[in-house]
């Protein structure tokens, strides 16, 4: 695999948003010193993470819906009661 694309990973991950979360988490693990599951020492951590996802070596350990809803619940809990947050 000369180049990794989102399309290479989508058959193994439900949607693009979940793919971003998974790739980000794995990239952070690699940058913190985790060993790559594939031998790509020359590539940067995000490329290694996407290659691992595309080959099925990295995946969510729970459903994507649970992972995403947990992320949103965490964000909601940081907003004080009665207030809203507007993104611009």
From Swiss-Prot:
Superkingdom of the source species: Bacteria
Keywords for this protein: DNA-directed RNA polymerase, Nucleotidyltransferase, Transcription, Transferase
Leader sequence segment: none
Bilayer-crossing regions: none
GO CC entries: DNA-directed RNA polymerase complex
Record-linked Pfam families: RNA_pol_Rpb6
Enzyme class: transferase
Keyword flag Transcription: yes
Enzyme Commission identifier(s): 2.7.7.6
Catalytic activity: RNA(n) + a ribonucleoside 5'-triphosphate = RNA(n+1) + diphosphate
Record flagged with keyword Transferase: yes
MF (Gene Ontology): DNA binding; DNA-directed RNA polymerase activity
GO BP, sorted A to Z: DNA-templated transcription
PANTHER family for the chain: DNA-DIRECTED RNA POLYMERASE SUBUNIT OMEGA
Entry similarity comment: Belongs to the RNA polymerase subunit omega family.
Oligomer status and interactors: The RNAP catalytic core consists of 2 alpha, 1 beta, 1 beta' and 1 omega subunit. When a sigma factor is associated with the core the holoenzyme is formed, which can initiate transcription.
Purpose: Promotes RNA polymerase assembly. Latches the N- and C-terminal regions of the beta' subunit thereby facilitating its interaction with the beta and alpha subunits.
Protein name: DNA-directed RNA polymerase subunit omega
Species this chain originates from: Anaeromyxobacter sp. (strain Fw109-5)
GN (gene name): rpoZ
